[in-house]
Amino acid sequence: MADLYTIWANKEGDISDIDFVNNMKSFLQHLVDEDKMISYRITRCKMGFRSVADMPEWLIIMEFKNMAQIDEAFRRVAPLEGELEDKHRSFNQFVAGDIQHALWRDYPDTF
């Protein structure tokens, strides 16, 4: 079982799609390399196909072992300093204000 932290976002500002994604990958891979996250995927709505008209174009899925690992990742990012923050800022400043977040878990839980 895993916890999936999902983000739906649109990109705005002066950055190419490739740079936006590559910068995001650098940040997320840093968390994977530090064992703060299991894996991630960055996806984009294909040809604008979606049933919800205002659903953001980008979907980022981050997989964690459990809530404790999510907490470790947030604690790692929260100081907003150093190389990791530079990587975070390199794409996050181009995320539009309509960002949405959700936390999912396999069901049923084993609790």
Task: Give the label of every model feature segment.
Residues M1-P79, Q93-F111:
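Short S/T/G/P-rich N-terminal loop/turn motif that feeds into the first structured element of a domain
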Residues L84-F91:
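C-terminal structural segments of small proteins and small subunits
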